[in-house]
């Protein structure tokens, strides 16, 4: 596995479950699964003009983790830094009904929700591992 850093830009939406799963899966990758490779990028800061976020995305590959069909992470990266290396689309992975379900507080997550987070985290890791 290459030692290259990879930016992971999660959905920041709070209206749907897909956003919550996106953020929790990204955190799991960053803290547990690929702590030496994953660098999380903050979407609100990115959009607001955060040069550090934007410059990182110009220099390193970025994986966008999209919670819904708006694809805000991909759009922001393409607008401010260039193409994303890959996309994890939660609606495609878990189903649109799941991605667009009512959001759940982190403290109210069920085992089923945690399983969804694990599925998305594994997909992020698979995409990271394909980057040589």
Language model segments and positions:
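Iron-sulfur-associated redox domains of electron-transfer enzymes in respiratory
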Residues: 1-132
């Amino acid at each position: 596995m290459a030692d290259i850093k990879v930016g992971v830009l999660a959905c920041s939406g709070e209206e749907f479950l897909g956003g919550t799963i996106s953020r929790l899966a990204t955190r799991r990758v960053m803290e547990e699964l690929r702590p030496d490779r994953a660098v999380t990028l903050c979407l609100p800061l990115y959009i607001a003009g955060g040069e550090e976020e934007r410059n990182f995305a110009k220099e390193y590959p970025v994986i966008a983790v999209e919670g819904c069909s708006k694809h805000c992470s991909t759009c922001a990266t393409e607008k401010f830094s260039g193409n994303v290396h890959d996309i994890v689309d939660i609606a495609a992975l878990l189903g649109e009904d799941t991605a667009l379900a009512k959001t759940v507080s982190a403290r109210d997550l069920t085992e089923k929700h945690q399983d969804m987070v694990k599925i998305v985290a594994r997909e992020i890791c698979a995409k990271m591992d394909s980057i040589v």
